[in-house]
């Protein structure tokens, strides 16, 4: 028995057909797994495309790769190696070492990734998302910031990724 709160099947995966386009009513959902058996199973039900999510963030008319990775760090500081990026982050975080227990999201982010990443790539997005200042948000919201020291813009680390070619409704049916 599956009980869905919404008036349609599929919950947040529900897709609406708008002029032949599958629109994810509640935001994009990208299926991802490292388990080949799971991937083979869902692909036996419906075909998936090979969509890879490689988002960009814009700050002051410059584009930055997400999640935070070596491409991002090169864009921010011109560094080329993981050691250089780690050193730059360590230097920036040192300015906030006096913060033992962060009392808000801003302090937590500054302690985890430093001023540049926070101000250019976290602060504005977070405040827009929550409709409040990062200083008013609890620290637990951003317990960790994934910092990847590889040149890979793939949002997920999983080997198998995609979206059902016919939309999620076909998979759910």
Task: Put a short name on every predicted segment.
Residues 1-18:
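Glycine-rich FAD pyrophosphate-binding loop
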Residues 3-5, 33-34, 166:
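Short His-Asn-centered micro-motif
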Residues 8-9, 25, 165:
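Short glycine/serine/threonine-biased micro-segments
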Residues 14-15, 31, 135, 171:
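Short, electropositive, low-hydrophobicity segments enriched in small/polar residues
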Residues 19-96:
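Dinucleotide-binding Rossmann-like beta1-alpha1 core, especially the glycine-rich loop
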Residues 62, 71-173:
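Active-site/ligand-binding neighborhood in enzyme catalytic cores
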């Amino acid at each position: 028995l599956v009980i869905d709160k919404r008036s349609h099947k599929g919950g947040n995966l529900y897709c609406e057909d708008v002029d032949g386009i599958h629109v994810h009513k509640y935001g994009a959902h990208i299926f991802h797994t490292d388990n080949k058996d799971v991937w083979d199973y869902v692909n036996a039900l419906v075909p998936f495309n090979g969509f890879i999510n490689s988002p960009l963030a814009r700050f002051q008319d410059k584009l930055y790769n997400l999640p935070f990775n070596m491409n991002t760090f090169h864009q921010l500081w011109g560094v080329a190696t993981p050691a250089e990026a780690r050193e730059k982050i360590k230097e920036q975080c040192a300015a906030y070492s006096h913060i033992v227990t962060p009392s808000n999201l801003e302090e937590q982010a500054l302690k985890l990734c430093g001023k540049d990443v926070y101000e250019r790539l976290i602060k504005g997005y977070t405040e827009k998302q929550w409709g409040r200042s990062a200083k008013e948000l609890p620290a637990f919201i951003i317990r960790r910031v994934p910092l990847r020291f590889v040149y890979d813009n793939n949002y997920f680390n999983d080997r198998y990724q995609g979206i059902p070619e016919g939309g999620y409704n076909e998979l759910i049916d």
